[in-house]
Amino acid sequence: MLLPLLISGLLFRNADAFLPFFNEDDLKYTFGVDTHAEVPNHEEIDPVPYYHQNGSLHKLEFMAFNKKYNLSLEPTLAKLLSSGVTVVKKNEKKGGSLDFGSTLDSCHYHHYGEKVYAAISNCDGRIKGTVIDDGEIIVVHPFPDHHAHRSKRATENGAHVVYKRETLAGEPKDFCGLDNVVTEESLVEDESAIFEDVFVTGQRLTQQSDLIVELAVFVDENLWRHFSSKHGGMADRKLQDYTLTLLNNIQIMYYQPTASPPLTFRVIRYEVLTRQPSALAGYLHNHGNAQMYLDRFCRYQRNLAVRDWDHAIMLTGYDIHRGAGSRSISGIARLDGMCDPWNTCTLAEGLDFTSAFIGTHELGHSVGMRHDEPYCQSKHIMSSSLGPGKVTWSTCSLRDYHQFLQRLDGRGKNCLRVSNMPNKLEISSNVKPGQIYDANLQCELMHGNGYQQVTPRQDSYDGICYMMWCGQSSFGRIITSHPALEGTFCGPSKWCQLGRCVPWTGTNEIQPTVQHVAPVVTTLPSRIDGSWSGWGATICSQCTCNGILGSVGLAIARRTCSAPYPANGGSDCVGSTSRAVLCSRQCGRASKSVDEYISDKCMEQKRLKNDRELTGKGSQLNRFPQRACKVFCDVQQHYGSQRNYRFFGDNLPDGTSCGYDRYCLDGECLALNCNNNALISRDQSCPTDTCPITDQSSSVYRGQWGTWSLWTSCTATCGGGYRKRNRACSITGQCEGNEDETEVCSSESCPSVLRVGNEWSTWTEWNHCSVSCGRGSQARYRKCLSPHRTLAFDCPEKNIEVRSCDNGPCNAIGVWGTWGGWSTCSTSCGPGTLVRQRTCNREPCDGSAHERRSCNVATCQNDGIWSLWNEWSDCSRVCGKGLRSRSRSCFGSGCMGASSEQQFCNEQACASSSANDWGTWSGWSQCSVSCGAGVKRRTRTCRTGNCPGNYKESAICNDRDCENKNAAWGGWGYWSSCSETCGDGVRKRVRKCYGSGNCDGQQYEKQYCNLRVCDFRRKF
């Protein structure tokens, strides 16, 4: 039976009469804006709710923007909250309260229609939520209570407003703090921060099970203070309702038809920080600097002793920013962070209802979604700018999402398919929480592993109902904790009720004991740990060669984590899904170097994406082992000499050389193992299968086609064009069928176009200043467009403008001390360097703590230059004072000083012994080369006394000549930066010898460079 609360009809009217009375807080609460000028187009409505007899909302009706909405609603609390959710409130003394979600109301609902989707909450009798209708987001929100009397037609439900989510006047377009530039510096400092590009071709995603994000929600002190000042004693309840309302609206966005597969968010921990922990203190992140606060929060949630969630989100009361004077962003997350304990974290402002849209976007980043631009239109959820109609997921987002899930499944570590939750028993009606979770378990849930109840004296045991104490050990630090849960043992035949220790009545309840009590019967499923299947067969006739110089042929076997799949919190399989047996050391038909292969791929990406930033070239990043088997494409350098890259998800072919006796397999660089016969990861044993290794051409083997690539963009938007796709053969030239495929597209007639010739688009907004304070630079951009509004490349002038900017003097936080004095010149004659330092009085400081400048004390009398010292030789004696030496080389002539030096070593007295006893020689090492003159070595140890003779021995090996017919140089690498910023300097480049044998010529090349004449007046 339905009970309609209003019979008066569906009412709507303009609410402008209210607005003059709204202060800044009212505007923020209702519309998420700061000024009256930013208020979007809106209407006042009187929604009509219908309730079941049990009090749950069943249906909602209202009229908005000349359309009637009739929403049938389903409750969602059971989906939003785990049955074992832990609710924690911490105060400044690390105490607080602990609960299991019993106080959370079921006041959140979803509507699923053919074209209309909605997330509605009515926790305080007022309607709040979003309706997604035909590409638009309509927000329903109550007016502030203290303005309700201004409505002449207000009902008992209170006055409500409805408005469309759109770009507001003055609202910053770039609300997201994620930076997706890949620089050479970021590769060096943090390889895990590489941001991959979109349009990655992968296999169709296999939906093995539901995808559930077990979520930990944290609320910081600033947001708690905001709710506390506004709601007083109701702050806890209001904050919980508000948080779940946000998540309810985020959830509906991930349940849309365009989100495939759907993603379910389930809260397993909700923690309010009424006092900010020291690790998150404001001065550590410049009071809301987005990147700094996110970094601190990621470390904080990772280091918590209690951690059983897939992702952590912090709702903050800070107006987060990029730096001094910048308040343009509202959220930030780690790209690809989901399931990575150090990076599975999101920071979002929580002061108004727009947090639901920000959270949706940022959580998308965590599951691999990049910004849509420039490859998809700016009209979807993952657009880098706010705007109307951004309620669906783009093709770019779904490709990123699917590829991310495939990577997780491929590693066997997809946390979204298994639960991290420990086996928590549900609390039945006749068992109280304190009987299921005894005092020790309560301490552990509140503070983490290792914490237990500090047992009080027997005469004061009943005090735990008011305040229970927890500590790490009998000698550890004691922490003021929380009142014990209802039903906790507090003395013989006593338990806690309403904060007091009272006798157990024995009526319909299980008697409390000091021991942990659990129901005998439980519906918890048993834990199933994942286990590897057997290896697939190694088929030597399918030996694959990739046509790249220096590669080897491989026969690959695979396995899956399916015997059984992990379930119910069971652990994943550990290790790799692939291994390979060597079947050819010298693949025939090799026609290109690794860098040539990479450049071909990068040119293909440049053509497919029509991206002028790509140079069409790339090179292997051998200095980063984790990236040596990935295809990185160079991006044009606009400033300085730092190289930038983009990664499009391509791996180098299996068998490609990635170092000395190291080769690629599934994008990983692995060393030859198992007597140089196999590529296996660290956890695997050597395969029993072997293949006859051949050095002949691989043309005797049949190749296999890979999957088709994505279709290219159509060559025309109308009037008939064509598009292409291609596929690769595992053995070049050994597959039947065509490598390329072409089809007609955009065959419809073109409309008449008045514009003639290409023209520039309007300039973008100036981007953010390069520094947070002081003087820096900023840029803006524009695109060259054809009459059909597609990208063109022949517009006159430049597509970028740069200007200086000044963010004002730097604030007191992060002030540099004065510079110290200059050091002495690093050389006594010729070019050298002076260095001086300064100290940051308080972090963070912009700029460098070191400054260098050139010096030249005197002209050297000769042109000789010493090399660096070699390593010290081994000591001549193991005890009793020996000697060791080192040497250096003179480049040129007339170097001043000695070419060698000695020093004493092992000066300790020798143990008394009548015999000097050598141990046996070790076995000979492998020869240092496979052909040509090499060296092998062996060693022995002096067991007693001071043994005469050497402890190591060398011998010549492999003195046969190398065959040079297959040795060939790869292309030269890039020139290094000039060693001097002005005056004469040196730059270098290097190339690699591929194949067997030695290449003729030099591996390294250097040349002099002179960027500009030094201005000594300015320099000194």
Curated annotation (Swiss-Prot):
Span of domain Disintegrin: 431-529
TSP type-1 domain ranges (all copies): 702-751, 757-811, 813-861, 863-911, 915-963, 966-1015
Phenotype of the disrupted gene, per the record: RNAi-mediated knockdown causes a reduction in adult body length and width and a reduction in adult lifespan. The cuticle displays several defects including disruption of the lateral cuticle overlying the seam cells, abnormal constriction of the annuli, discontinuous alae and mislocalization of collagen col-19 positive fibrils. Prevents the up-regulation of a transcriptional reporter of the TGF beta-like dbl-1 pathway, RAD-SMAD.
InterPro entries, A to Z: ADAMTS_ADAMTS-like, ADAMTS_CR_2, MetalloPept_cat_dom_sf, Peptidase_M12B, TSP1_rpt, TSP1_rpt_sf
GO cellular component: extracellular matrix; extracellular region
Cited function: Regulates body size probably independently of the TGF beta-like dbl-1 pathway. However, may regulate some dbl-1-mediated transcription. Plays a role in cuticle collagen fibril organization. Required for embryonic development.
Domain comment (free text): The conserved cysteine present in the cysteine-switch motif binds the catalytic zinc ion, thus inhibiting the enzyme. The dissociation of the cysteine from the zinc ion upon the activation-peptide release activates the enzyme.
Protein name: A disintegrin and metalloproteinase with thrombospondin motifs adt-2
Provenance organism: Caenorhabditis elegans
Gene designation per UniProt: adt-2
